[in-house]
Regions:
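Phosphate- and other anionic-substrate recognition elements at nucleic-acid/protein interfaces
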Residues: 1-79
Length: 79
């Protein structure tokens, strides 16, 4: 399989929390849980940037994804 992004993140968003899985090309992954409060979403953004993650895929059920997208869109490519 061709590697398109060396580091990426998948995010599953719920009403009060989200689960983010950071995946590296060497097969390593790190899973963290964040609340959907703004301060925690900013911590999520900072964590992703510190890991040199450039692309994020968000599971977009309902409207819960919108605050996450709004925080991440200026710093990362959000799909």
């Amino acid at each position: 399989m061709k590697v398109v992004h060396k580091i990426c993140c998948g995010i599953d968003v719920h009403a009060k929390m989200l689960v983010a899985c950071l995946i590296l090309t060497n097969g390593q992954k790190e899973i963290r849980t964040f609340s959907t409060m703004t301060d925690d979403l900013l911590r999520l953004r900072d964590w992703l940037q510190a890991a040199n993650c450039t692309h994020v895929a968000i599971e977009s059920t309902g409207v819960y994804w919108k605050p996450v997208f709004n925080i991440l869109e200026d710093a990362l490519t959000v799909i």
